[in-house]
Design a protein with these regions (language model features):
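N-terminal leader/targeting and accessory segments in enzymes
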Residues: 1-134, 138
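Phosphate-binding loop of NTP-binding sites
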Residues: 97-104, 113-257
């Protein structure tokens, strides 16, 4: 484990770093820099598994960390080891510091959305100057791939009604003859969607404030914030921070629905 600083010396990650020189050129599936990239993946739920599996397919050196060593995570860990993930640490103590990857410092952390900005491993990564991405950020960078269609992204967030609206958007697009899928925080993990061999015309993404907090370069075809009410203040630290996370969906969008 790296990072001698105590928790008291660290601060919650309110403005996560997007890139370093090592990650700045990782903007397509075919970018050569994925191979050998040292990545720590936090969380081994559906999202974390998808992230680790994708990165292993790209040739990255991956260490996964999760505090839950229950049977479901142990089964997932075994599968990830088979596909080439270097190490899976299922121990609460392992979540308290930033692990090395192949005996060296990590280049990148990709976090599951449930991990809070005041989690010790994430604070240590930020203090060390590492980029911290969501699965959505990773998927956005991987969306272009030689020989595959590049889908348009339609992104929806808000305090209430996200799942209903995204499911409706998916149905409307399919009725119009387009190959579409509801993904992100609902349905199919977004990394599974972009790896689909047939590809999609449109991804209808439900995005949580947790995912948006760790997302940096997203530039969708269209975006909407359905509504905004006080929620998840304990995770974000304040209502202003919660609203700012939701507002990131508009930062680079081509069409904003307000």
């Amino acid at each position: 484990m790296t990072g001698p600083a105590s928790d008291a010396a660290l601060a919650p990650v309110r403005r996560p770093r997007a890139d370093t020189a090592r990650t700045a050129d990782l903007t397509s599936w075919d970018a050569p820099g994925w191979a050998g990239l040292r990545v720590v993946v936090t969380g081994l739920g559906v999202t974390g598994f998808s992230v680790a599996d994708t990165l292993a397919e790209l040739g990255a050196a991956v260490v996964v960390v999760d505090g839950d060593d229950g049977p479901e995570n142990r089964a997932r860990a075994e599968t990830l080891r088979i596909v080439g993930v270097r190490e899976v640490l299922l121990d609460r103590a392992a979540t308290q510091a930033l692990p090395e990857v192949d005996g060296a410092a990590a280049d990148l952390v990709v976090t599951s959305p449930g991990w809070r900005p005041d989690q010790p491993l994430l604070m240590a990564a930020h203090a060390a100057g590492l980029p911290i991405w969501s699965d959505v950020e990773l998927a956005w960078r991987l969306r272009e791939r030689a020989g595959r269609k590049t889908a348009d992204w339609v992104c929806l967030t808000g305090t209430n009604g996200k799942t209903t609206t995204v499911t409706m958007v998916e149905a409307i697009l399919r009725a119009d003859g387009r190959r579409a899928v509801a993904c992100g925080n609902v349905g199919t993990p977004v990394l599974d969607a972009i790896r689909d061999p047939q590809g999609f015309d449109v991804l209808a993404l439900e995005l949580s404030s947790f995912q948006l907090h760790w997302t940096h370069g997203l530039a969708p075809a269209s975006s909407a914030v359905l509504n905004l009410a006080e929620d998840h203040v304990d995770w974000h630290g304040s209502m202003d921070e919660y609203a700012a996370a939701k507002g990131k969906v508009y930062a680079n969008t081509r069409v904003a629905c307000v």
